[in-house]
Curated annotation (Swiss-Prot):
GO molecular function (one): arginine deiminase activity
Family: Belongs to the arginine deiminase family.
Protein name (record): Arginine deiminase
Catalytic residues (positions): 391 (amidino-cysteine intermediate)
Subcellular location, record wording: Cytoplasm
Broad enzyme group: hydrolase
Pathway participation: Amino-acid degradation; L-arginine degradation via ADI pathway; carbamoyl phosphate from L-arginine: step 1/2
Organism whose genome encodes this protein: Mycobacterium ulcerans (strain Agy99)
Keyword list, A-Z: Arginine metabolism, Cytoplasm, Hydrolase
Gene Ontology cellular-component annotations: cytoplasm
Amino acid sequence: MVDELGSNSEVGTLKVVILHRPGTELRRLTPRSSDQLLFDGLPWVSRAQEEHDQFAELLRSRGVEVLLLSELLTEALHSGAARMQGVAAAVDSRRLGIPLAQELSAYLRGLDPVRLSHVLTAGMTFNELPADARTDVSLVVRMHHDADFVIEPLPNLLFTRDSSIWIGPRFVIPSLAMRARVREASLTDIIYAHHPRFTGIRRAYESRTAPVEGGDVLLLAPGVVAVGVGERTTPAGAEALARSLFDDDLAHTVLAVPIAQRRAQMHLDTVCTMVDVDKVVMYANVVDELTAFTIERQPDGVTISDAAPFVEAAVRAMGIEKLQVIGTGIDPVVAEREQWDDGNNTLALAPGVVVAYERNAQTNARLEAAGIEVLTIGGSELGTGRGGPRCMSCPVARDPLP
């Protein structure tokens, strides 16, 4: 077990990571609900589990300690305070009405940690409400279809990158932008607040008022953080995070990187990820377009520069001579296909060693030609939620870079 937790880069040797093995929450997806729950298709769940098990086993084979979110949550829910917190976040009295909310809350508080953990992640339909949680005076119960959700499932828990971020020795619980994902942050909050593994570790970014998501946050180098601003993270969120990191001495420079507000580029890590201390894989169609506003800590406050080309701004902030950009292919059709299939969304296990989906053959070949070791996993079903190995992992501990 690794005792010292934290991370100051994207590529330091990975020691501890949080994953979430997909389960019942994915089986809840239907053609009627998939758009609302942010999935582009209906995954074959058993195959998705096989692919995820392969991913987890690959990490373990490389010496990474894999923590599973559902197990951490179950262990944290032995705390009475954690149970109260989880139930309060899951039961929406504005949607359910006071009578049903009260009965449901009382029922959930009486569940054992394993069962409560399952409900908090997989959700619950009206048909699954036990008799003692049904109230005859609830119009909500009478008017809802049995298959409707009294507690909505969280299929996007698969993407543990977004709901918590480790920067230096601290963690950030962000504010997620999409309604279908808001409650995910409450579960990571419970884990970090009540699981003994994280006792004494301090939180960063206390505000959590403006949306910031982990997929938009890249630790380019010690003290240098890039934050994508687009569909999920707002300018206000990026600025609030930057000022918080400066106040806590966790960064000296933050690059705010505007990205297109569309599904294919929902986060910065869908178009760009670090694969070595001075190498980045980037979607070819944005290489010449990506810019950055440089936010720097100063003795008397902060300064914000005008937008400059992203690579130039990154090189200057990182204090290196060159940042090698590895493109995703010359053929624009292949590049677009592989970007959609998360070809740029790699997880670094060490400098120059990454995990990638096997289906992105051209991107992987270009990485290997640039001297990067590429470890591949299947992702035909995992990718239906538009996330790759980086999206599916929350690094909790990496060896620090100097």
